[in-house]
């Protein structure tokens, strides 16, 4: 049964990545992050509560104004800076139609993951877990990169490091991206895909 599941991961899942939401018309948010005044710890806690509540209520543009000063002042304060920040930046990305602005914002989304690794130490969600999230976002926002080599490296590190604690969605994408790379040059990448398949199979055994 496990092998059937793994084969399904390779061949039954579409290779197109993630669909983008429909672009909305109208006023668009500013892309370049404004220079904000550094907040005190007390002010950061207040803003943290405000942006978290705004995200819960899907008021993402309002949340951005509270979130950005906390992110810039105390990036080590709370995991919500990164969990909520990903939602806030994704919302802003969906509002923007200018291609250069979208490229700048998607770079900011990847940087959010880098900053989480650098500033926020979390035993429950270690660096390898965050790399999995970063890879998934790369596949979502950089869909034009057909081979997605950066995402492949992050996915492989996430799976090989986390083992039984690897996320199924990340494991699935790891096999999918590896197979896509293999298809681009079967002679060059056959050994790599076989090794990745074996790693995914062993990891799936651990999870199950």
Regions found by a protein language model. Name each.
Residues 1-27, 86:
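Bacterial Sec-dependent N-terminal signal peptides
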Residues 20-208:
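Preference for long, solvent-exposed alpha-helical segments and helix-linker "stalks"
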């Amino acid at each position: 049964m496990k092998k059937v599941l793994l084969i399904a991961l390779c061949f039954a899942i579409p290779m197109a990545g993630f669909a983008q939401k429909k672009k909305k018309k109208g006023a668009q948010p500013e892309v370049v992050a404004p220079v904000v005044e550094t907040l005190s710890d007390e002010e950061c806690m207040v803003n943290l509560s405000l942006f978290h509540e705004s995200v819960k209520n899907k008021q993402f543009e309002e949340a951005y104004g509270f979130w950005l000063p906390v992110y810039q002042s105390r990036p080590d304060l709370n995991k919500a800076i990164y969990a909520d920040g990903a939602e806030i930046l994704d919302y802003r990305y969906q509002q923007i139609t200018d291609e250069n602005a979208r490229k700048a914002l998607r770079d900011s989304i990847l940087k959010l993951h880098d900053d989480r690794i650098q500033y926020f130490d979390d035993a429950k969600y270690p660096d390898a877990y965050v790399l999995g999230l970063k890879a998934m976002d790369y596949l979502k926002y950089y869909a034009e990169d057909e081979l997605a080599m950066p995402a492949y490296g992050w996915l492989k590190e996430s799976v090989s490091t986390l083992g039984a604690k690897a996320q199924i969605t990340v494991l699935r994408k790891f096999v999918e991206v590896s197979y896509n790379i293999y298809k681009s040059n079967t002679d060059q990448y056959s050994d790599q895909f076989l090794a990745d398949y074996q790693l995914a199979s062993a990891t799936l055994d651990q999870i199950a």
